[in-house]
Amino acid sequence: MVAGIHSLLLLLFYQVLLSGCTGLIPEEGKRKYTESGRSSPQQSQRVLNQFELRLLSMFGLKRRPTPGKNVVIPPYMLDLYHLHLAQLAADEGTSAMDFQMERAASRANTVRSFHHEESMEEIPESREKTIQRFFFNLSSIPNEELVTSAELRIFREQVQEPFESDSSKLHRINIYDIVKPAAAASRGPVVRLLDTRLVHHNESKWESFDVTPAIARWIAHKQPNHGFVVEVNHLDNDKNVPKKHVRISRSLTPDKDNWPQIRPLLVTFSHDGKGHALHKRQKRQARHKQRKRLKSSCRRHPLYVDFSDVGWNDWIVAPPGYHAFYCHGECPFPLADHLNSTNHAIVQTLVNSVNTNIPKACCVPTELSAISMLYLDENEKVVLKNYQDMVVEGCGCR
């Protein structure tokens, strides 16, 4: 980990110093590196540790995640990430995702996924229906995030057996919010219907149910979270139809089971009030091009951040790295048009030409863009989040 920190964080550290940024680097570290030019290994490691903590804080993390080796990334979250990349690469007016998914993501900059607690008890079932209770621990959702929508995803398997009638090919799945748990064994819980779906047996697929009202009640209104009741009604009571075609529990033969990939999943879409939503198009301004530009003048330089070099690839699922770029170069008098200067920078440079006590304008980022990251948080929950101001799109003298 120490070697990884030195390989990339030192590079980031010096480039941020060169670019004139003041937000990421601790002031103590700045003085040590700028005044002495060289520090002891202990001082260097302490500053780099502070820098890593600052970066983690920028990602909204209190500590470095250390996920276990058996953590499973839901395929749906990977699909969301790749669909988002396809959306960014698509031409204006085209979309790579369905309407429901795009509508949910258009109001959120964070997507979180939760697997249910498998220790929850099963509600006794009857010949006509299969009923089970699901509980999801949502304590990892920060208080400052506003949940804009939520969906419960349940996998159902294709039924191959012959049917006595067309009606026996259908099942109805009802999703209930448990408003009040059962007070006694003889009485069931108080529930409220959230969503319902009439499903056909002809294919294996995921079914998505809108559970936004329940999540909003639990989080926004600070009301108790007692979980959901999933009810599968077997229409026509055909004895040939397997009652377990909707996967709501683990198989008794886990060695032959793909349960981790198809277990029920709760997905929340939220916004922390920072930056743009995941699928809101951002128009980028065209960068100024100049045929003859001095190599020493202010311009954008390549900088690739490889998360494996820092040892963060165990909790950052995607991307493996990204092109951050940085700004560096001179802002000479007089400032040329291609240096994208402000009026204040022009005046400051003019004053510097006659009074060197006034510093020159600095070469800094003038336009930044966001990246999306899929990662595991401190609680091993999979998160897809849009991070603002991560990529330098343009530089100028300011």
From Swiss-Prot:
Pfam families: TGF_beta, TGFb_propeptide. GO terms for molecular function: cytokine activity; growth factor activity. Disulfide bonds join 298-363, 327-395, 331-397. It comes from the Eukaryota. Gene3D superfamilies: 2.60.120.970, Cystine-knot cytokines. SMART domains: TGFB. Keywords: Chondrogenesis, Cleavage on pair of basic residues, Cytokine, Developmental protein, Differentiation, Disulfide bond, Glycoprotein, Growth factor, Osteogenesis, Secreted, Signal. SUPFAM superfamilies: Cystine-knot cytokines. One of its GO terms (biological process) is ossification. Glycans are attached at residues 137, 202, 340. Residues 24-284 form a propeptide. Residues 1-23 form the signal peptide. It is found in: Secreted. PROSITE patterns: TGF_BETA_1, TGF_BETA_2. PANTHER family: BONE MORPHOGENETIC PROTEIN 2, TGF-BETA FAMILY. Induces cartilage and bone formation. Homodimer; disulfide-linked. Belongs to the TGF-beta family. This is Bone morphogenetic protein 2-A. It comes from Xenopus laevis.
